[in-house]
Curated annotation (Swiss-Prot):
Compartment annotation: Cell membrane; Synapse
Listed name of the protein: Neuroligin-3
Function: Cell surface protein involved in cell-cell-interactions via its interactions with neurexin family members. Plays a role in synapse function and synaptic signal transmission, and probably mediates its effects by recruiting and clustering other synaptic proteins. May promote the initial formation of synapses, but is not essential for this. May also play a role in glia-glia or glia-neuron interactions in the developing peripheral nervous system.
Gene transcribed to yield this protein: NLGN3
Oligomer and partners: Homodimer, and heterodimer with NLGN1 and NLGN2. Interacts with neurexins NRXN1, NRXN2 and NRXN3. Interaction with neurexins is mediated by heparan sulfate glycan modification on neurexin. Interacts (via its C-terminus) with DLG4/PSD-95 (via PDZ domain 3).
Annotated glycosylation sites: 50
Cystine pairings recorded for this chain: 15-49
Protein's membrane topology: Single-pass type I membrane protein
Top-level taxon of origin: Eukaryota
A Pfam family per the record: COesterase
Extracellular topological domain residue ranges: 1-202
Protein family according to the UniProt entry: Belongs to the type-B carboxylesterase/lipase family.
Length: 202
């Protein structure tokens, strides 16, 4: 948006520890020990992991990307990916070029033991929230549309039941008062209290 290069990544690796079994996925912040080279030092109180050679290699890769970006704004240069000091063969990151992110292609780097450049991060989940949910919400509004030109007919209140002798009277009610109407009763006062709210009995 402002002309500065943007590089998008998703970290898909985590160290092995008792707190995080092998079948679990990477979580937010799992790249932190790799950024600061913890696998090269060994387990710490903060990161009690069983670091392998692959963890050391991945840490070297991440530190190279981060320091390159800090120096030049491009994680691919000036220092190329090279971890032969850890493995006898080249790692796959040496064959991957981390592309810039743009709204059209939406490329990002999948960082893990099998790195690759992918596009449209979590496209299905993003489409659900950006397109399907708003669409369903708009359908809800369509079915609850209130007309601005059609008036709702007025409801006529029901009349009191009548008998040949006139309105039906409730036993004990004053003469001429229909039985369906409530009578107001006053709640008793408590000691030292003011007037109570009035209730109705049917």
């Amino acid at each position: 948006r402002y002309g500065s290069p943007t590089y998008f990544y998703a970290f898909y690796h985590h160290c092995q520890s008792l707190m995080k079994p092998a079948w679990s996925d990477a979580a937010h912040g799992d790249e932190v020990p790799y950024v600061f080279g913890v696998p090269m030092v060994g387990p710490t109180d903060l990161f009690p992991c069983n670091f392998s050679k692959n963890d050391v290699m991945l840490s070297a890769v991440v530190m190279t990307y981060w320091t390159n970006f800090a120096k030049t704004g491009d994680p691919n240069k000036p220092v190329p990916q090279d971890t032969k000091f850890i493995h006898t063969k080249a790692n796959r990151f040496e064959e991957v070029a981390w592309s810039k992110y743009n709204p059209r292609d939406q490329l990002y780097l999948h960082i893990g033991l099998k790195p690759r450049v992918r596009d449209h991060y979590r496209a299905t989940k993003v489409a659900f929230w950006k397109h399907l949910v708003p669409h369903l919400y708009n359908l809800h509004d369509m079915f609850h549309y209130t007309s601005t030109t059609t008036k709702v007919p007025l409801r006529i209140p029901p009349t009191a039941p009548t008998s040949p002798a006139g309105p039906m009277a409730r036993p004990g009610a004053p003469s001429g008062q229909p039985s369906h109407l409530p009578t107001a009763t006053r709640m008793p006062r408590g000691p030292g209290t003011g007037t109570r709210m009035q209730g109705h009995s049917w």
